[in-house]
Amino acid sequence: MFTLPPVLNSSYVGIHGNSTFINFEFSFYTLPMLFLLVPILYIPITIIIILRILVKLYYAFRDRNNNVYLLSAISISQCMCLLFFLADFLYLRLPTSGLLTSWCASIEPNRFITILTIFTYHINYSTMIFPFLVSIMRLILIISPKNHKKFNGQLLRFSIPFICVYPIIFTFFMFPAIGYCSYAAYPFPFGAIIFRIERTFFGLVNNFSLLFNTLFWMTCCIITNFILLLLLIKSRCLLNAQTRSMHSYKVEVSLSLTTFSMIFSYLSNAMIVFLLLELHIVGHYASPIW
């Protein structure tokens, strides 16, 4: 029989109640603080891209464009990326900057940190699937140009609920946990903290499942885009020179850039997971509930 964990004793968990961290004085001149400011560069660009895609989606709905489902998937994907940036900012960048250290050391372990942890992992797992979904929809567009609207519509209606539910498989064991603040080990400077959780179901951790999902969806995305590229090259050879220069070449360049950006995002995510595993940050869950 499962029971919810009692509130953790702050005297022996993380930095809670530790006077050294309570009296910590934050400094702007640290490397984690620089990383905290990095999102200022790419989040506005992401918002502009999302707005442009939404405008195109509006006109696609108005004009009954056949690519409306593909544009819808891309729009949702970009919105999920924006949520991921927000989760990454709150879960990793903000605490490691040292801004929350004194405050976090003066409070008790709580479930708000658990909620933030679950939200971050949920968004991360969901975001991984969208590049593969967009690639499949583009593949359907090439393979079945006459019926792609029907197939892509059915695929999108199935995929959205699946993407919402799928991450629960890898986060359900976090639901009864208690979140707390812990100091971040080297190479982070003194005062940098990270969020962790205690007492998950069965003592399950999220490190290898996160790595598995990253590699799995990256592999699926690479295979799908490789097939797309082959089909695109084949179709390009069948077009006349004028059509090829005006249409196929632009699509091929766009596809190549899209493929590269997708693979790069997976690789960067995998490298971060490897780094955090090395630092014992990802999946540091203890004291299982029975």
UniProtKB/Swiss-Prot annotation:
Bilayer disposition of the protein: Multi-pass membrane protein
Localization per record: Membrane
Keywords, ordered alphabetically: Membrane, Transmembrane, Transmembrane helix
Domain of life according to the entry: Eukaryota
Residue stretches spanning the membrane: 31-51, 70-90, 112-134, 158-178, 185-205, 213-233, 262-282
Main localization of the protein described in the UniProt heading: membrane
Nucleotidyltransferase is among the record's keywords: no
GO cellular component, one term: membrane
PANTHER family on file: SERPENTINE RECEPTOR CLASS U-26, SERPENTINE RECEPTOR, CLASS U-RELATED
Protein family: Belongs to the nematode receptor-like protein sru family.
Protein name: Serpentine receptor class U-26
Species assigned in the record: Caenorhabditis elegans
